[in-house]
Amino acid sequence: MPPETTTDDERPVSALQSPEEYLGDLCGRHQIVLLGDQVGVRQHLGFLAGTLTELADNGVENLAWEFTNSRSQAELDALINAPVWDSRACADLFVDLLGAGFGYEEYAEVLHAVWRHNEAERRRDADRRPIRVIALGLPTYVEDPDLLDGRSAGELGLRNWSLGGHYRDMSAFHAASVLTTEVLRRGERALVYMSVAATTTGLVEWVDGSPTTSAGNLLWRWMSDGCRRVVFHGTVADTAATERVEELISRSPEGRGGTDIRFGLDLAASTLGSVAMTEVHGSLDGADTSLRLREVADGYVYLGPRADWEPCALIDDLITDENFASAEARYRALDPRPEPYTRDELDEVRRSGQQELSGAWPPLPEPPEEPKRRFARFRERGADR
């Protein structure tokens, strides 16, 4: 008899929550949920754009992110609340981030998705509160080439410094302050989408022998259980842990079912939470200790294997005649030279940055080495005798 085949309808249904349901439910139970990511992962931005209905249904009024500078909040509000979508105004917001390299279609699509969601909600229920996007980005004064006297920010040691303090620390205090003013004091809820390094809560990471400060650290000290950290699979820079998580998933009932797996879960009571972290260095409650995944994050979103990540696509025609002068001045502050850059040169800089996105992500696990065929060669020599 031929072997029995399992149809799609007969495969076991996973008891895990979908990542959208999980994130919406978590945001409904905590005032601030920090979602940590690497820069430029296409699938993750698509997921974020698709969570808006779940967020709104769970009472979340705000999506905060660091990919628009706070100085552009008025323009961001006008874009999201406009009666007609303005793709040019959206692109201009990302010109303000050209030096940091966020002129990508998928980031713009998140803003467009918020606009579409709010427009649909207004048509259905005029009293329903829209989702607001809160800008957390903090530019530095080294963007002005006139302040650098022909030298680069790197040469002057200023690239990571702002207002007399280290930029990572200053941006952390800035983001926490904005969230306090715009969310906490209003008694509202927010999903905060930031780079994974900015979302640490109880964990204090050490870089070059010194402790770091993140927006998540500050919020967690103020709010404790009111603040939770969620990370995407593969975003924490620990290759061995990423490999171990994928191994555990492949051995799970869902993994053996042969279907695509997507889920979100709390790590505290999960087997995945016990995965050891060997490449993340930091302290909990002031003491250095060996870390497990549940001590690095509260929640986990799995959309697929780390090897499936794809980089975002560039926004077409980001640089125009109207914004070229300001964009050129900002880039010349980062990479100064006597003569101004041309528009073609700025476009080439953007293309190079897009090609380098994947190189900045945590590395993939090394594939296992194939065994050497020594015995085969020995048999071949024996046969010749």
Predicted features by range, described:
Residues 1-385:
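Compositional signal for N-terminal targeting/processing segments
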